[in-house]
Structure formats: structure tokens, C-alpha cells
């Protein structure tokens, strides 16, 4: 029997409507409009595409947006000056600096300059620390999206063994911290695997929930998955192009084989991807409410 397909596009659409209603109510009751500033350095086509999608989503939800493009030759000082201005701008609830950045720019220096209260990507050390302590913070968008996918799909997390393959600062590490918390939608036993892990299939096959975030197409095969497990595929790799020039994407999981063994599985595309941008919008809304003293 084939697995239940967890449709991230549908779940993200439901959250989008919830956010739209909140944005409308926030404006009507308090005269507050959430605002997102995006900063893009250089002309990388993929980065342009990502930023464009975020701007369009803001427009769709009634969130004010500003875009600040900078040339490839921009310096640390250029970015720090811009971020200081955005930090001080009351119209801006959240600031997003699109990464990767050119080699001459210190990513840590720039991201750490963002006011933690406007760090809607959840990358600032203050937010990372709050996340680890289980305090109110902005959760990184992709890990938060994974948690929401599980919760809204009715999949129990509490008490389960979650195995995460990948230890990046963007996905693996924060997701482990999120799911470890003694809180609803968490409280799992978490194992992290990585390039130095020995006997990887032995560990992954013990998972109730298996999350792969490596960027290695079809690396997770059916023999690495326990019968009846939930499989979340965060990996997204371009493996080619259609004759029309559209990207062909592959996840980390051998989807066709694994879906015959799993209880539930996310596809690529239309799985985790749509959740990332909607979590960014949710963080921007939350930032606006916090700035107004409406939530903690």
C-alpha cells in the first residue's frame, strides 16, 4: 500500500489564508501593516527568483514590502549601513538578507547586524539561543515548516524517534532543537546523522520520523527506511532542465521506492518547499505584533 502523500502546497495555502485574515484584522483594529524588507546583492538568477517569490507573497497577503538590490561589488559597509537604516525604520517589521552573499562580504557580520526583533529568518545568535532554551523567538523558516507539516498532517511527534540526516545550521541543527523541546508538537527523541556517521542505514531504519536534508538526489533508499515510517524530504537539487528550460528537481529520497514502504512521505516539489516561504510570512506578521506589544 502506497504512503499518504503530504501535500505541502495545500497546507501552505491553508496557512496563507490564516495569515491573510490576521493581516487584515491587524490593519482594521490597530492600523498596523506588517512590513518586510528584502536585500539582494548581485545578479544570481536563483536568488532573484527566491526574492521575487517572497515579494509576490507579501503582495498577496497585504504585507508591505521593500526591495533593496545592491551590486555584486557591494561591501560590508554598504550592507551594514543599509541594515542600520532598516533596523530603525518603523515601517519594517522584518529584514531578510538573501544568501549566499559575494565572497567579499562577511555573512556572519551582516546577519548579526540585523535587530533580533526583525530577524525573521531566525539566523541571529540571539534567536538561535532563545530557540535552544525554548523561549519566544523567530524559528528558522524551513525547520519550522517541517514541524508545521507534521502537526497539520496529524502526525504524532511526541515520544517518537526522529532521525535527521544533515547537520546544517539552516535545517538539521535547528530542527533537532525544535523537536527536542518539551512542548506540543515536539518532545521527540532526536538523532542527528551526518557525513561522519557510521552504519547510517542501521540508524535511519530505526526512525519513526525520518528527515533528510543533505542535497544528495535519491540518497535515501527503501532499505534505509522502517516499514510504516514518516519520511520528510527537505533536499531539493536541480538535476536538469526540460526542453522549455524549466528546472527538474530531485529530493534526497528515492520517492517511488520509499513511498511503497512509508506511512507518509513528502514529495519534491510540493512538499517542504512551499512551507518555507509561508513561515517567513508568519514570522513577519509575528514581528509586527511583537513590535506593537500585542504578543510576546
From Swiss-Prot:
Position of the signal peptide: none
Keyword Amino-acid biosynthesis applies: yes
Tagged with keyword Hydrolase: yes
Gene3D superfamilies named among the record's database cross-references: Leucine Dehydrogenase, chain A, domain 1 (3.40.50.10860), NAD(P)-binding Rossmann-like Domain (3.40.50.720)
GO MF terms, alphabetically ordered: methenyltetrahydrofolate cyclohydrolase activity; methylenetetrahydrofolate dehydrogenase (NADP+) activity
Catalytic reaction list: (6R)-5,10-methylene-5,6,7,8-tetrahydrofolate + NADP(+) = (6R)-5,10-methenyltetrahydrofolate + NADPH; (6R)-5,10-methenyltetrahydrofolate + H2O = (6R)-10-formyltetrahydrofolate + H(+)
Superkingdom of this protein's organism: Bacteria
GO biological process: L-histidine biosynthetic process; methionine biosynthetic process; purine nucleotide biosynthetic process; tetrahydrofolate interconversion
Keywords: Amino-acid biosynthesis, Histidine biosynthesis, Hydrolase, Methionine biosynthesis, Multifunctional enzyme, NADP, One-carbon metabolism, Oxidoreductase, Purine biosynthesis
An annotated GO cellular component: cytosol
Listed pathway(s): One-carbon metabolism; tetrahydrofolate interconversion
Annotated residues for binding of NADP(+): 166-168, 195, 236
Family membership: Belongs to the tetrahydrofolate dehydrogenase/cyclohydrolase family.
Subunit organization: Homodimer.
Protein name: Bifunctional protein FolD
Organism expressing this protein natively: Dehalococcoides mccartyi (strain ATCC BAA-2266 / KCTC 15142 / 195)
Gene: folD1
